[in-house]
Amino acid sequence: MTETISRNIIFIVIVLLLTALVVSNPSYAANSASSLGNVDSVLQNIVTMMTGTTAKLIAIICVAAVGIGWMSGFIDLRKAAYCILGIGIVFGAPTLVSTLMGSS
């Protein structure tokens, strides 16, 4: 009981400190026109991280592990297919979105 309360208090303190840090920084409010550029670059970095070389290598290892688990009987075929389908969706998302948006 007291451990849960102390965790909640620590969580609230951390959230308040992070909020104070973000609100107290004047650069966020100084130039609202360039703030979207910062958001765009952060989101682009996330997409690059999710579809980059390291992510592809991790996906290869995961597919191999799922295949071995399926052949050994530890993972059923449905869960293996969901894993492979999820990897395909993650790596196919940029192409799918650009196709739907009609990129020029």
Curated annotation (Swiss-Prot):
It comes from Bartonella quintana (strain Toulouse) (Rochalimaea quintana). The keyword Transmembrane helix applies. InterPro entries: TrbC/VirB2 (IPR007039). Its main location: membrane. Residues 1-29 form the signal peptide. Keywords: Cell outer membrane, Membrane, Signal, Transmembrane, Transmembrane helix, Transport, Virulence. GO terms for cellular component: cell outer membrane. The gene is virB2. The chain crosses the membrane at residues 57-77, 81-101. This is Type IV secretion system protein virB2.
